[in-house]
Amino acid sequence: MFQFVQRALLLILAALAVAGCSKQALSFKSVDITGANYAQAFALRDVQGQVRQLTDFKGKAVVIFFGYTQCPDVCPTTLSEMVKVKQALGSQGERLQTIFITLDPARDTAQVLKAYMESFDPGFVALIPTLDELPELSKQFKVYYRQQPGPTPTSYTLDHFAGSYVYDPQGRLRLFVRYGMSPDDLAADIGQLLRD
């Protein structure tokens, strides 16, 4: 009888172990970079002058994109797509925070950035590194940018990194989003993070 009880207990424990391990792994259209040891933190001023950190947005999925307001194509396209992502998430869209970090603090003043963000979504947050902070920040986030001269000293453009980073509601870096990914695919990925 003792052996029967012992075997029954072992079978129950084995079944529980299998059930506990049966949580389906998440599958993303974005590049899964869970566990990456870069792009982990920042402390930058927003357009109101308040210092913001990634931890300020705990409980939300966060998408971070680097750009500049005079960008002719990549930046407005990406921000327009983030509006669509938020809409595609429906009621969960309120748990998505888009953060735009300028690569052009010389021209992207708080006033300029505030108006720029409001033209897409007033809930988007713009952050402004100082010219001294920008090189280390770009290194930490593996963001390439390079100034290309224009006809006047202030009419330059920037070649820059066009991807985005996605953090889960616990503040962990999870995904790299390539430029041009469809808003519906990105919304599906973010939806998984919000439900996980």
Language model: regions and residue ranges:
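Thiol-based oxidoreductase modules, predominantly thioredoxin-like and allied folds used
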Residues: R95-D108, F124-D132
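A short beta-strand-turn-helix
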Residues: F42-V62
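Thiol-/selenol-based redox modules, centered on thioredoxin-like
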Residues: P151-D196
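Short active-site neighborhood of thiol/selenol oxidoreductases, capturing the structured segment around
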Residues: T55-P76, M82
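Bacterial signal peptide processing site
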Residues: S22-Q24
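C-terminal motif of bacterial Sec signal peptides marking the signal peptidase cleavage site
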Residues: V18-G20
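Short, internal strand/loop/helix patches
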Residues: K114-F161
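Conserved helix-turn-beta segment immediately C-terminal to the redox Cys motif
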Residues: K60-A61, T77-I101
